[in-house]
A protein has these predicted regions:
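Conserved PLP-enzyme active-site core in the AAT-like
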Residues: 1-191
Length: 191
């Protein structure tokens, strides 16, 4: 996607402890001043390029299972960007257990998300820790500032999708959603 769009990456570095566990990006690195500083130090950004950040991507939870307070990440990164993507490949179960309150992209009540809040994307590989077939995944979108037009999103999505969809994979997403619905999700995440 970065190659196709011409985006220039500007990395936010996570911490790593002495056990080798990759931790979170420190909160101070998510603040507007830190983002501006790393952009100014980025050798890929020249004077003739608009250096305004437009999209942030954070892995949540990390591969080692550490998870962010998504609400806080949005508050901090919302000072710099209008769109946020949480890569939640291993974290599709979080909404279904109160222990993870505010620690996943689609936290809280969608009705509480204001049009002035950032647009949030979340991707979840439902085949990893939910009951979907291999390669199954979800994309969730909570619209806010600078939301992406649905037809534009669908066109971009279809560029990456197969012209021969595998209906058992699609059906497995429906099944995993049904399994997690209601009391089932809490029961399955309590064990």
């Amino acid at each position: 996607a970065m190659t196709m769009s011409g985006a220039i990456p500007n990395y936010m570095m996570p911490l790593r402890n002495f056990y080798g566990i990759i931790g979170p990006i420190p909160p101070q690195a998510l603040q507007a001043e830190a983002i501006k500083k790393t952009i100014s130090e980025n050798s890929l950004i020249t004077k003739d390029i608009d250096s305004t950040p437009v999209h942030a991507i954070v892995t949540n939870s990390t591969y080692d299972g550490l998870c962010y307070n998504a609400r806080r990440v949005e508050e901090l990164l919302g000072q710099s960007v209008d769109r946020m993507h949480f890569d939640e490949a291993w974290y599709g179960y979080a909404r279904f257990n109160p222990i993870y309150k505010d620690r996943f992209a689609m936290y809280g009540n969608p009705a509480d998300h204001k049009p002035t809040d950032m647009t949030v994307f979340a991707t979840q590989s439902t085949h990893k820790l939910l009951a979907a077939l291999s390669q199954a995944s979800f994309i969730h979108i909570r619209e806010g500032k600078k939301n992406v037009d649905h037809s534009r999103f669908n066109e971009s999505f279809m560029m990456q999708a197969s012209t021969s969809p595998n209906y058992p994979i699609i059906a497995s997403n429906d099944i995993t959603a049904a399994m997690m619905d209601g009391k089932g999700g809490k029961a399955l995440t309590d064990e």
